A protein has these predicted regions:
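Short acidic, S/G/P-rich loop/turn micro-motifs used as interaction or catalytic elements
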Residues: 5-10, 39-40, 68-75, 100-104, ...
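Conserved Walker B catalytic segment
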Residues: 103-119
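Short, flexible loop segments at boundaries between secondary-structure elements
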Residues: 117-139
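A short, acidic, amphipathic alpha-helical segment used as a generic capping/interface helix at domain edges
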Residues: 74-88
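C-terminal functional extensions of proteins
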Residues: 133-156
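Conserved P-loop NTPase "ATPase switch" module shared by AAA+ and STAND
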Residues: 89-105
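Long, charge-dense
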Residues: 30-75
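N-terminal, charge-rich interaction modules
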Residues: 1-48
Length: 156
């Protein structure tokens, strides 16, 4: 679900409403909302990387930290972690938020490609602050990507 970045607060509010509505009107559906920022923090904390990351950022800056976290946050490790932690195989729908908050540590197209092989045809709704034209995503409407996606726009 792509949306204008300036509508972030409206989307968060609507998502809260949507979750309540799904729980009320479709209680048989199992829906999980994965906030990617919280997932990254939890993942790093479980591996005792938080304090090290803070120290590295203070000592060497953002670029060094981003480079150092590429290995631990590689999709071969992080995508299976999400599937396991959030029991996504037991869910009917997976909602994902926080894409803008985790950039540039995580890239949406890498995440979607990795999850596709793990989740198969399970519906994943990625709340994306930017634009998707059917072929490429543009985070915040400013950061282009020319990757192919197996996605479609939820609301044309």
């Amino acid at each position: 679900f792509d949306y204008a970045p300036e509508d972030e607060l409206k989307v968060r509010e609507y998502l809260h409403f949507l979750e309540g509505m799904l729980e009320k009107k479709h209680s048989q559906l199992k829906v999980v909302n994965i906030n990617l920022l919280q997932a990254v923090v939890d993942y790093l904390a479980e591996r005792n990387f938080i304090d090290k990351a803070i120290q590295m950022q203070k000592a060497k800056g953002d670029e060094a930290l981003i480079k150092a976290l590429k290995g631990p946050l590689h999709m071969d490790k992080f995508a299976p972690y999400l599937v396991s932690k959030y029991a996504t195989n037991e869910q009917d729908i997976v909602l994902m938020t926080g894409v803008g908050s985790v950039w540039p540590l995580l890239r949406a197209h890498h995440l979607l490609n990795s999850l596709h092989s793990l989740l198969g045809h399970k519906p994943v709704v990625l709340f994306y602050p930017g634009y998707y034209d059917g072929q490429a995503m543009s985070l915040f409407g400013k950061i282009p990507s020319n990757n192919y996606y197996r996605a479609f726009r939820l609301v044309p």
